[in-house]
Amino acid sequence: MLSLLIIRATQFAITSFRCESTIYRYCAKYYYIGFHNHKDLIGVKEFCGKHYILKIIHYHMKAYYMYPDIRGDLISFTSDDDVWLLSLKDMKPLRITSGLGVSTRPKISPSGRKVAFSVIWLKSGKQGGDIYVVEDGQARRVTYFGSRNSRVAGWISEDEIIVITDFHTPFIQWTEAYKVNVNNGKTEKLPFGMLSNIVIKDDIIVIARGYQDLPNWKGYKGGTKGELWISSDGGKTFEKFVSLDGNVSWPMIVRERVYFLSDHEGVGNLYSVDLKGKDLRRHTNFTDYYCRNASSDGKRIVFQNAGDIYLYDPEKDSLTKLDINLPTDRKKKQPKFVNVMEYMNEAVVNGNYIALVSRGKVFLMRPWDGPSVQLGKKQGVKYRQIQVLPNGDVIGVNDEDKLVILGKDGSEKVINKDFSRIERVKVSPDGKKVLLSNNKLELWVYEIDNDNARLIDKSEYDLILEFDWHPNAEWFAYAFPEGYYTQSIKLAHIDGKVVRITTPYGYDFSPSFDPDGRYLYFLAARHLDPTNDKVIFNLSFQRVVKPYLVVLGNYYSPFNQPLDEANSNDKNVIIEGIEDRVVPFPIEEENYVQIAGAKNNKIFLFSYPIRGLRSQTGDVFGRLEVYDLENKAKELYADNVSSFSLSSDKSKILLILKDSLRLFDVNVKPDFNSTGRKGGVIDLSRVKVYVEPEKEWRQMLRETWKLMKQNYWNEERLKNWDSILPKYERLLDRISTRFELSDVIQEMQGETRTSHSYETAYDYDTPEPLSVGGLGAEFEYDESNKCYKITKIYVGDSTNENERSPLRDPGVQLNVGDCIKNIDGEDANGNIYSHLINKDQVILDVITADGKNKRVTVKVLKDERFLIYRYWVEKNREYVHEKSKGRLGYIHIPDMMYQGFAEFYRLFMSEFHREGLVVDVRFNRGGFVSGLLLEKLLLKRVGYDYPRNGKPIPMPYFSSPKVLVGITNEHAGSDGDIFSFLFKKYKLGVLIGRRTWGGVVGIRPRYRLVDKTYISQPEFAVNFEDVGFGIENYGVDPDIVVEIKPDDYVNNRDTQLDTAIELALKQL
C-alpha cells in the first residue's frame, strides 16, 4: 500500500481509499498523482480544498533485512519490526505481521503455509517476549514463557517447532530446548540440557553451545565461544564436534556436511565440515561486515550481512545477494511527540527563567506563564549540562563537546575550544566565567568575554565532578580526587592560585558556597563510627557523612557566636589558616549525598535512605532537609525527590520529583498538596518535545562512536576508529525502527573486539509487555481427565519473598499428583500459562490425587526466577551433604554484586563449620565484590575456641576450612573471571570446570543516549602480574577441565559437582 506523508496536514479524515491506475480518493475528492520510473511519488496539487506540499517518498526501497530463513523458493526475514515473506520466483515481499512488537527470527514450516517467530516487547524499560505463529494471515501466540530470551530454532513437523528459551532455568545464560505444538501450545522439554541451538536430521543431532550472535564483540575467543556437539544415535551419546579459535554458530545440516558461521579467521564467514568434524572449508570471503543469523532448509543457506540477505547454494557453490525492495511506509520512522517528563534529565532555574533538557533538546520558559521556546538546533541534537545566564540565554554543551550559548532569539554561538569530553559545567554568578571538567580528569576555567581558557588542576585518579563559585565570581571550590578512595576540598582563584583546605585522608565532596560569601559548605565521610553487622561477624560504617563549613574570613563560626559582637559582613576570602577554620555541623551523621547553601541562612541537605541494594531497581528518590543556620534546627523540606538545584543567586529551589517539576522560594515551606503556582507546579504541558527519529538515530550513532573514541582504555588500539563511523553510518538510511538502530550500534561497538561494549535500549516503540504469572511448578497434560497434572513443585525458602511456590501457600497446599481442571472458570486446556497472563490471583479448580474436588485461590508469582534459583542451590547443597556424609558444605555465588554478596554469606554462615567447602561460581554474571569474598575465604581456620558447653568454635571466628574446591564454567565472567583467577592465584584450592567467559575490561556506567539508552565503553583493562592482559578475550583455565555433555543432562548428571566432591573428599 502506498503511504503519503502529508506535511502540516495533521487533522483530517480519510473517508475512502481506492486505486484506479494513479487515481486516489481523499475527502471525497479525486487527485492525480505523478510517478517517475514507476517508483517515486513526485507531487500533488490539492488536498481537501487546501494546498499542501508532499515530501517525495519511495514506494519501493532498500531496507534493513535481518534473520532470514528459507524453505524451497520461499524466503522469510524481518524488517520494519515485522515478518516478511517473498518468493524467489518474483521477488515481491509481502508483510505478514503488523504491529505485534519487534518480530524476529522467523522460521517457515515444511509446507510453507506457516511461519513461527519471536516477538520482543520493550516499553519504557519493561521487557518481555514470546513465540507466535502466522497462518493464513492470522498471527497467534503459541508460548507463554514471558521471556525475551526465547526464539524458534526450527520446525520438527508441520505442527511442532523447537523453541530455545531460558524458561524455568536458574540463570538467563542457561537456555534449553522445548518442543511446542503450534496448534494447542502444549510444550515438552527436550532432555539435552543447556544449549543455544539444535538441528535434527534423522538420528543426527547437532547441538550448539555458546554464543550464536555476538555483534557487540567481534573476534570473541573466550570460554563462551560457540562450539558444536554431535550425536549419531538419536541423542543417546554426544561428542564435541567443532571447536575453533573463534566463535562457531548457527549449525545447519546440508546433505552430508554441517555448515556454520565462524570468525576464527578474523571476519564472520560461512564454513562447513563433514559429519566427522573434518575437512574444514570456507565458502564465503567477506572482509568488511560479518555474516550473521544463518539458516537452511537442508538444501540452500541464507544469512544476513550488513542489512542484506545472501543465498548460498552448496551444490553449485554459488553466492547471490538478493535484490529486495520493500514496499513499506516506515511507520516507526515518522516524527512523533514524546513525554517531556519521561525523557527530562536536566532542569535549572535562574532569574525569571527555567530551562530544561528533554530528549536532548533545550527548552526555555518563564515559570508561571507564557510559552516554552525550544533553543538551538531542533532535531538530531543532544544538548547537556545547561545553565541559564543572567540575560536569559542558555549555555551548555553540544554534540561535539563544545560549549555553546543558545540565545533566546534562536541564535547559537559555538565556543570552538577542544576540552575533550566535558563532564560538568558551572557558570559564575556574573555569567562571565565557566568552570568545566572533562574525561581527562582535568578542571578548566573559561572566560566568556575574552575567550580565554586556563587549566586549573588535574587528578591522577578520577573525574572532578563537583565544584561551586563564590558569589564574587573570583574564587571557586572543588572536590579533588587525591587517591583511589580519598578526596579533598580545594579552593582556587581565577588567577590560578590553588589552596587545599582539607587533608587528603578522608572523602570530602559537594562543596557549596554560602550566597553571602561567608562560608563554604561541604560533606565529608570522615567521622568513622562503626556499628555491628546484624548477620555476620563484622563491623561496618553505615552513617558516616557529616556536613561541615569553612569560615572564609576572620570571624566567628556560626556555631560559636560571641555574646555581644555581631558577625562580620566582610566577604573577603582569607587564605592564611583556612585549614583551621573547618567546623562540623552539630548534627548526626547521615547518608548525605549533596549540600547546598541558600539565601537567608538556609542549607539544603539531600540524602538517600539506607536500604538493601539487592532488589533496588529503577530510579532512586531521596529526602531533602533544610537546616536553618540562625535557629540551628533541621527539618524535612521534601520527600521522594529525584534531584534539586538552586538558582544562581540561591534564592529559589527547583525540585525534580517523580512526576512533576516544582519551583519554590527557599524561604517558603512547600505545599505539595496544592496545584498550580501555590504548589510550585511548573506546567510542563507547554513543552512539546517533537522527535524526528531519522535525525535522532544518526546523532545517537555518532555519539556512541565518539564516546568510544574518547573513553576506550587504549587509544593506540583505536587508531583506525575514524574509519568505523562511515562504515556504519551508510546503513542508517536503510533502517526503519529503533530495534534496527540497536543492531547497527552493536555491530559498530563490536569493532573494538573488547568486552563490556554494551547498548541497552529503553524503548523499542512496542506495546507494553504483560507479565505471565507463575505457579512455581511443572505440569503435564492428563488426556483422560482433561487437566494439568502437577509433576514437580519447586521448593525454595518459604521465608523469602518469591522463593516459595504459591501452590504451597497456607490454605492452598496442593501436591504433586493433583490435577488443575479449571483456571478462573475456564477449562485448563491448551497452554496452561495462557490462563495466567496479566493475572495477580487466580481461582483453581483441582482434582486431588485421591480423586477429591478442591477449589483454591492462588496469588501467582510475577517472576519465578528466584524460586527456581533457590531450588537449584538447595538441591546442590543437599546433594553435597549426602555424598560427603555431612563433611562438605556448598556455596553458590550467582554474581559479584549485591545478590552474590548476600548469597555468599547466606550459605557461608551455615556451611563454614564443615571440614571442606565446594565454592561454585558457575554462571556468575560479574560485578565488583570478588575481593570482599576472597578475604573471607583467605581467612583460614587454625584452631578452635572451646567453651564449657556446646561445640568448639572455629578460630578465627567465621574462618574458612582448609579444604576448598572451586567450580567455574564458561558463563562465569567479568568479576567472575577475576574470582576464578585469584582462587587459583592464592592457592585456595583446586579449580575445576571449564574456561571462563574472558571479559575483564571494566566500565564506568554513566552515559545514556537521548532516548535513555544505556551505552558503555571499555575503560579499565585488568593486568595481572602472572598473565598480563591475558584474561581478556580468553578467560581463566581451570586446573582440571570437566565437561557436562548433553547426554549427562539426559542422565541427570552434574559431572562438575561430582568431581568437586570427589576431589575435596580425597583431600580430607
Curated annotation (Swiss-Prot):
Catalytic center residues: H756 (charge relay system), S974 (nucleophile), E1032 (charge relay system)
Localisation: Cytoplasm
InterPro entries found in the cross-reference section: ClpP/crotonase-like_dom_sf, PD40, PDZ_sf, Tail-specific_protease, Tricorn_C1, Tricorn_PDZ, Tricorn_protease, WD40/YVTN_repeat-like_dom_sf
Residue ranges, annotated region (PDZ-like): 771-864
Region (Seven-bladed beta propeller): 338-686
Gene3D superfamilies: 2-enoyl-CoA Hydratase, Chain A, domain 1, 2.30.42.10, 3.30.750.44, Tricorn protease N-terminal domain, YVTN repeat-like/Quinoprotein amine dehydrogenase
Region C-2, residue ranges: 865-1068
GO terms, biological process: proteolysis
GO cellular component terms listed in the entry, alphabetical order: cytoplasm
Residue ranges of the region described as C-1: 692-762
Keywords, comma-separated and alphabetical: Cytoplasm, Hydrolase, Protease, Serine protease
Keyword Repressor found: no
Any one Pfam family match given in the protein's UniProt record, by short name: Tricorn_C1
E.C. code: 3.4.21.-
Residues involved in substrate binding: G927
Region of interest (Six-bladed beta propeller), ranges: 61-326
Family to which the UniProt record says this protein belongs: Belongs to the peptidase S41B family.
Function field: Degrades oligopeptides in a sequential manner.
Name of the protein in its database record: Tricorn protease homolog
Species of the source: Saccharolobus solfataricus (strain ATCC 35092 / DSM 1617 / JCM 11322 / P2)
